[in-house]
Amino acid sequence: MNCPFCSHFESKVVDSRPTDEGQAIRRRRECVSCHKRFTTYEKIEEIPLIVVKKSGNRESFNRNKVLNGMIRACEKRPVPLNKIEAIVDHIEKQLYNSMEKEITTEFIGTLVIDQIKQLDEVAYVRFASVYREFKDINTFMDELKKLLKEKPEEA
């Protein structure tokens, strides 16, 4: 880091401490040439995730939309909110770890549907009916038949 006073390229760190609830590090530096001190902040670069909608429109990823969709699907079901939030955290982590700058709504929906299926079957059918845009009762029944076929026999 160049010194802001003399532009020398070398400095030494005199003090480091976390700030902003651990999201950044504040460093006191001293220039090895002019011996003046200055402060720098180091924080993780956040890459914004862009969601590509079915219409082709693009918008920033909003985890609350995923959370609200799952809460709506789980309404009046015995699913604790902390489980839903943990799934949304997991999905968000998967999206950021994908290293893609643009994510389709279809990809997000697939991640949600895979997770919600393991959580609650009724919530899964509710979410799938919206996500897969069931047009009529036959489409709905086909999805139920698939779900029943996948379900292991109970003794």
Swiss-Prot record:
Tell me the superkingdom of the source: Bacteria
Looking up InterPro entries in the UniProt record yields: ATP-cone_dom, NrdR-like_N, RNR_NrdR-like
Zinc fingers (unnamed) at which residues? 3-34
Q: Where is the ATP-cone domain?
A: 49-139
Pfam families for this protein: ATP-cone, Zn_ribbon_NrdR
MF-aspect GO terms: ATP binding; DNA binding; zinc ion binding
What are the names of the required cofactors?
Answer: Zn(2+)
Q: Does the keyword Transcription apply?
A: yes
Q: Does the keyword Nucleotide-binding apply?
A: yes
User: What does the cofactor field's note say?
Assistant: Binds 1 zinc ion.
Q: Which PANTHER family match?
A: TRANSCRIPTIONAL REPRESSOR NRDR
Annotated function: Negatively regulates transcription of bacterial ribonucleotide reductase nrd genes and operons by binding to NrdR-boxes.
Similarity remark: Belongs to the NrdR family.
Q: Which HAMAP family match?
A: NrdR
> What name does this protein carry?
Transcriptional repressor NrdR
Q: Which gene encodes it?
A: nrdR
